[in-house]
A protein has these predicted regions:
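Acidic, proline/glycine-enriched N-terminal capping motif
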Residues: 1-135
Length: 135
């Protein structure tokens, strides 16, 4: 099974991640997953790979040349948002909803890039076990 969904990137600004903001964002991520899958989830023993793309809003003061470099992937976003924190928040939000436990995640790929529309794209891929017991 493979599931891809998107959520707004509400954690993209320089800000403190308060427990309330994180709780609210986790709820939003869960809702987006459930909307996409109509409440299905991965098997409890299924190894999973998760791919997260965090699209941060381009700075307002960016010149047209800087914007072009950002769109073409030649300007790295080494500032905000904190990629590690967003990855952790997304994985924890989906625990118990998309999968039983985060220990099922065997591979995480996370990148961040610039965009006009800040958002977080999440793809989860599972390897369903065959009936003969082989992966």
């Amino acid at each position: 099974m493979k599931v891809t969904f998107t959520a707004p990137n509400k954690l993209a600004k320089k800000q403190t991640y308060t427990p309330d903001k994180i709780k609210e964002y986790k709820k939003l991520v869960r809702e987006r997953f459930l909307e996409e899958t109509q409440n299905s989830r991965f098997a409890e023993d299924e190894p999973l790979e998760i791919y997260i793309t965090v699209l941060a809003k381009m700075p307002k003061g960016a010149t047209p040349e800087e914007q072009a470099r950002m769109f073409n992937g030649r300007a790295n976003n080494a500032k905000t948002p904190d990629l590690n924190k967003i990855t952790k928040i997304v994985c924890e939000a989906l625990e118990g909803v998309a999968y039983k436990d985060t220990v099922q995640i065997t591979k995480v790929t996370a990148i961040k890039a610039w965009s006009v529309y800040p958002s977080v794209w999440v793809t989860i891929e599972g390897e369903e076990r065959k009936s003969d017991g082989h992966a």
